[in-house]
A protein has these predicted regions:
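N-terminal periplasmic accessory domains that precede
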Residues: 78-82, 109-116, 139-142, 161-167, ...
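Extracytoplasmic beta-strand/coil segments of soluble accessory domains associated
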Residues: 114-115, 123-187
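Short acidic/polar hinge/loop motifs at secondary-structure boundaries
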Residues: 183-211, 583
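Transmembrane beta-barrel wall of Gram-negative outer-membrane proteins
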Residues: 247-276, 281-317, 340-358, 441, ...
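Face-selective signature of the C-terminal outer-membrane beta-barrel domain
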Residues: 301-310, 343-520, 552-554, 564, ...
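Membrane-embedded beta-barrel scaffold of Gram-negative outer-membrane proteins
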Residues: 355, 361-379, 554, 560-566, ...
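Gram-negative outer-membrane beta-barrel transporters
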Residues: 496, 609-622, 637-732, 776, ...
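C-terminal beta-signal and adjacent terminal beta-strands/loops
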Residues: 617, 657, 668-669, 722-738, ...
């Protein structure tokens, strides 16, 4: 934010290339204001700022040096820009430094497009700058600089992303609103928010994370927003090819190939990604195919229309979970040879953007999903509830044939939605401001069916009702969902340093559950004596308002203080309620969760020497849903009570070269620290032995540190993470003794530490990347699964190697 008096000012001009000709599609930014524009076909730009003052004007396009200039303006100003072409022989260190300066590492602007981020805790991952195992979506490396994240690791090559934070269950990132290029990608935003699809890191330019205050603009989730921003088409090129071929341990193979370019007003980006591996445990191989296409038509400098389509299919074998005893004896052991998981995902979106002026913008999108997921496996004898679902053998007869059939769960997802946003800058009675008004309509109709699968070993996802009519885990449900929301935020610039951003969100949610389940009774000899089909139809209709308030205060030219309080709400995921499992039961009286998120912090505005963000937070969680265990080792999911989670989050990235005042343009040496101290307690609960206990999924210390280094075309990264122990259930249970049916299901996750080392070397159009994940070969686990891919302990991947060859033309 500049230092200003109240007036309306236009900054305009023409951008020229190295030959003195007007240059189109150059990004023009006025730093720290959120004001930006792309030059038109005549190279012209025109930006308006609400206040006079000192600003930094930035112009950037690929292949040219960044133009940066401090300007002091008090009236309309004309500034022409002459770009200087980059040398073809620049080293990788210099190129990455250029990108860092353009994108202002680690922060979202106050306003970006039709979105407001003022006063919100947010973080941005610049994926191109990561030196790590992007071929396998290694979450430890990709998300290493996002504070306080708790990551589930399953050794599945990054097919699914499971992250949480601040006491939120990491399972499939279900406590975040997950989006791709701004639209929803989960099976059902309210009824089934789990993320089965995760874009490959090689296709991403940014990963944007906005914490709990994102509830007002994006949805009511406590975790906030994760937005995967895909690479954009290469400007100034008709065709750009990037081919990345990777190999690694456990017969890992990845082939990522993309094409992009701009032809006249049409630009495009498309890729195909194939990935496969045998897995680090027996019976844990997978194959994945993913394709994506983005087309954008730029009618003029003010109006564009884009279409994108995503397809994903993968088949993964699952090794099953372990008991604590099994893990201690052999952490890569597998006693499940015929468990499978399959995904088929189709996403499409149409996005329209129009700038009425430099002050007023409109965006409208339509998106939809058609998808399926199937899980098949043996998880213990469903009739004998007194046996261990983790340790029980998958029995065979004397001929070597399996005795029991497998359990099959099939889900079909159909949803579509629209989102409309209008953002405008204005001036009212001498006070500048920015307002955002938006609306979203979302409708889904999903089905979930559970029943007897085949008795074989292959990935056969067909039900076998005729052979097993009395299979106890049978259900067939349809889940229609309807959601309408209206939201708004407004930035009031009180003076040159202080801004206030109130906001609201109105939600109307109508959820239905229509279906039947089988109630099967057995005698002592496990023979069926009764099989009754029970009808279970429910409907939930609710409307409510959420409010929030954000504050931001500029502290000199290099830092900003921010504060935010926001209401949050999380709908019960009804599509899971009637899924029957030998070890998983849902309380029929379960209700929605609600609460508040508060952030207070200070962060850097410039990143030349030190990029930092230090904050404290609080999260009040009422009617928090958790899991208790009954005396048969069944996990019962229900509303546990009121929980309070609080802590401090510290991030710092120090550029040692800059701090030493050395003019070493060919050298990179950065050290980062990423630390979260978190405490928690259940304040109230109707359950015995819960009040006063710590909230599950919260390590008291979540510490990550590392060094990123480089010399000319050689880049490197070494990082180390440590998480203290964390509980996995609301009663803070200790590990069950050997022989107890709950062994592997209850108990804390022990503290663990992991180290990763990666290198990258660039030469002209080629790049070689290589590294070692889990350098010290630490045996540890991050998860006790309640169901698939377990139940039980899911070991994390042992030491592995990878090498990637990239060719770019």
């Amino acid at each position: 934010m500049g230092y200003f008096s109240w007036s309306q000012i236009e900054v305009s001009g023409i951008v020229y290339n190295e030959k003195g000709r007007p240059k189109e599609r150059v990004e023009i930014h006025i730093q720290s204001t959120g004001v930006n524009q792309m030059t038109d076909g005549s190279g012209r730009y025109g930006l308006e700022v609400a206040e006079a003052g000192i600003y930094k004007l930035i112009a950037f396009t690929y292949g040219y040096q960044i133009f940066e200039k401090l300007i002091q303006i008090s009236s309309d100003t004309l500034i022409d820009i002459a770009l200087v072409k980059l040398s073809q022989d620049l080293s990788e260190v210099v190129i990455l430094d250029q990108k860092q300066r353009v994108f202002n590492l680690g922060r979202l602007n106050t306003v970006e497009g039709t979105r407001i981020y003022a006063g919100k805790k947010n973080e941005v991952i610049l994926v191109d700058q990561i030196v790590g195992n992007k071929a396998s979506n290694n979450a430890r490396q990709v998300y290493s600089q996002i504070v306080g994240l708790n990551i589930y690791e399953s050794g599945d090559g990054g097919l699914q992303l499971s992250i949480g934070g601040r006491g939120l269950d990491p399972n499939r990132s279900a406590n975040f609103n997950t989006r791709q290029n701004g639209y929803d990608i989960s099976p059902d935003v309210l009824g089934y928010p789990e993320s089965y699809y995760t874009p490959p890191a090689e296709a991403l330019s940014q990963i944007q994370v906005v914490r709990g205050a994102a509830a007002l603009q994006y949805g009511t989730q406590f975790g906030g927003l994760i937005n995967f921003k895909m690479h954009q088409p290469a400007p100034g090129k008709k065709l750009e090819l990037i081919a990345r071929q990777s190999v690694g341990s456990f017969n890992f193979l990845s082939s990522f190939n993309s094409l992009s370019g701009t032809v006249g007003k049409l630009s495009y980006y498309t890729y195909f990604h194939h990935k496969q591996s045998d897995g680090f445990r027996p019976n844990s191989g997978y194959k994945s195919n993913n394709t994506f296409t983005y087309l954008n038509y730029q009618f003029n400098s003010e109006t564009s229309l884009s279409f994108e389509y995503t397809y994903l299919n993968y088949l993964a074998q699952q090794s099953g979970g372990l008991t604590d005893t099994q893990f201690d004896l052999d952490p890569i052991y597998s006693n499940r040879t015929r468990n499978w998981f399959e995904i088929d995902w189709n996403l499409a979106a149409l996005n329209f953007n129009h700038n009425f002026s430099s002050k007023t913008k409109l965006s409208a999108m339509i998106f939809g999903l058609v998808a399926e997921r199937n899980s098949l496996g043996y998880r213990g004898n469903p009739i004998n509830l007194n046996s261990s679902p983790v340790a029980e053998d998958d029995y065979k007869d004397q001929n070597g044939d399996f005795i029991y059939n497998r359990d099959l769960i099939a889900g079909v997802f159909r949803n579509y939605g629209t989102e409309l946003r209008l953002l405008s800058r204005y001036k009212l009675k001498g006070t500048a401001g920015v307002f955002l008004l938006g609306t979203k309509f979302y409708k889904s109709r999903n089905t979930a069916k559970q029943g007897p699968g085949s008795i074989g070993i292959d990935a056969n996802f067909n039900f076998n009702y005729e052979r097993y009519p009395d299979y106890p885990n049978q259900s067939d449900f349809t889940f229609p969902n309807l959601n309408f929301s209206l939201f708004g935020e407004n930035i009031f610039f009180i003076n040159e340093k202080f801004a206030v951003t109130p906001g609201f969100r109105f939600e109307h949610i109508f959820t239905e559950s229509e279906g039947v389940y089988s109630e099967v009774l057995f005698d002592i000899a496990q023979n069926p004596i009764s099989n009754v089909e029970q009808i279970d139809d429910r409907s939930f209709n609710r409307s409510f308002m959420l409010f929030g308030l954000g504050l931001s205060h500029t502290i000199g030219p290099k830092a900003e203080g921010y504060a935010n309080i926001s209401q949050n709400y999380r709908s019960v995921t009804f599509s899971d309620i009637r899924t029957v499992s030998p070890t998983f039961i849902v309380d029929p009286d379960i209700t929605d969760e609600q609460g508040y998120t508060v952030d207070l912090g200070i962060r850097s505005l410039t990143t030349k020497t030190l990029n930092f963000d230090v904050s404290i937070f609080g999260l009040l969680y009422d009617d928090r849903i958790g899991i208790i265990l009954d005396d048969r080792a069944n996990r019962v999911r229900k509303n546990i009570g009121e929980a309070f989670i609080y802590g401090m989050e510290i991030f710092g990235d120090l550029n040692l070269v800059s701090s030493l005042n050395k003019d070493w343009k060919e050298v990179k040496l950065n050290v980062f620290i990423n630390t979260a101290f978190t405490e928690s307690s259940y304040l109230a609960s109707e359950e015995n032995n819960v009040k006063g206990k710590k909230v599950e999924f919260i390590p008291m210390l979540n510490f990550k540190t590392g060094v990123n280094f480089g010399f000319r075309n050689l880049m490197g990264s070494l990082q180390w993470i440590y998480l203290s122990e964390q509980f996995t259930d609301v009663e803070n249970s200790t590990i069950a003794v050997d022989g107890d049916n709950r062994n592997g299901l209850i108990g804390e996750i022990p503290s663990y530490h992991v180290m990763d080392l990666s290198f990258a070397y660039s030469f002209k159009n080629f790049k070689i990347e290589s590294g070692i994940n889990n350098l010290m070969n630490t045996f540890y686990f991050t998860r006790r699964a309640t169901s698939y891919p377990g139940p039980g302990i899911i070991p994390s991947e042992s030491r592995s190697f990878y090498t990637t060859l990239q060719v770019k033309f």
